[in-house]
């Protein structure tokens, strides 16, 4: 398991969170 994978998953989670906020405002 490389730390890059965990970091990637975390970034993906952050992106999903931001997208949800943006869509909620639209």
Swiss-Prot record:
GO biological process, one term: oxygen transport
Predominant location: secreted
Keywords: Copper, Oxygen transport, Secreted, Transport
Tissue-by-tissue expression: Hemolymph.
Subcellular location: Secreted, Extracellular space
Organism of origin: Carcinus maenas (Common shore crab)
Keyword Secreted assigned: yes
Purpose: Hemocyanins are copper-containing oxygen carriers occurring freely dissolved in the hemolymph of many mollusks and arthropods.
GO molecular function: oxygen carrier activity
Name the UniProt record assigns to this protein: Hemocyanin subunit B
Family in the record: Belongs to the tyrosinase family. Hemocyanin subfamily.
Assigned GO CC terms: extracellular region
Lineage, broadest ranks: Eukaryota, Metazoa, Ecdysozoa, Arthropoda, Crustacea
Secreted as UniProt keyword: yes
